Design a protein with these regions (language model features):
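Short acidic (Asp/Glu) and glycine-rich catalytic loops that position anionic groups and cofactors
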Residues: 8, 37-42, 109-111
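Intein/HINT protein-splicing elements and their conserved insertion hotspots or analogous self-processing inserts
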Residues: 123, 131-141
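Hydrophobic alpha-helical scaffolding
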Residues: 13-17, 50, 120
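Single conserved hydrophobic/aromatic residue that forms the stacking wall/gate
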Residues: 1-7, 12
Length: 141
């Protein structure tokens, strides 16, 4: 890291940004922060509604991470609307919502960043869709 003193200011770097930085900056500008699924830092956020669904949420995270899907779990004791809004602001491509009904039926309620509510799906069926998006490097946000 190059350092130079100019008056009372200090610049950390005196070179233009590099190739990788320019590419990331271009992608962030083009997609307004809503990166394609395969490129998003957090691809899936699992949101549990009840404490009883928290264990299943962790199991789903483990399954997705075993398959290379970057996943976070939100087991906080907050209203589900608040959790969904927070995930939308973070521009997470998929939100998986788990309550007692979903756990009982062995499904997840799926919300997509762009397409909204996709209804209930089997996690393995959804995983196939996600893996296909990663493999094809789909640019749709």
């Amino acid at each position: 890291i190059a350092q130079c003193l100019v008056g009372s200011e200090m610049c950390i770097r005196d070179r233009s940004i590099g190739c990788y930085e320019r590419t990331i900056a271009l992608l962030l500008e083009k997609y307004a922060g809503a990166l394609p699924f395969w490129l998003a830092p957090t691809q899936v956020k699992v949101l549990s509604i009840t404490d009883r669904a928290a264990e299943r949420a962790n199991e789903i995270r483990d399954l997705l991470e075993e398959n290379g899907i970057r996943t976070e779990v939100d087991n906080r004791n907050e209203k589900i609307g608040y959790k969904i809004r927070e995930a939308q602001l973070e521009k997470v491509p998929y939100m998986l919502i788990l309550g007692d009904k979903e756990v009982e039926n062995g499904v997840v309620s799926v919300r997509h960043r762009k397409n909204g509510d996709l209804g209930q799906m089997d996690i393995n069926e959804l995983l196939k869709i996600m893996l296909a998006d990663v493999k094809n490097k789909n640019l749709e946000v």
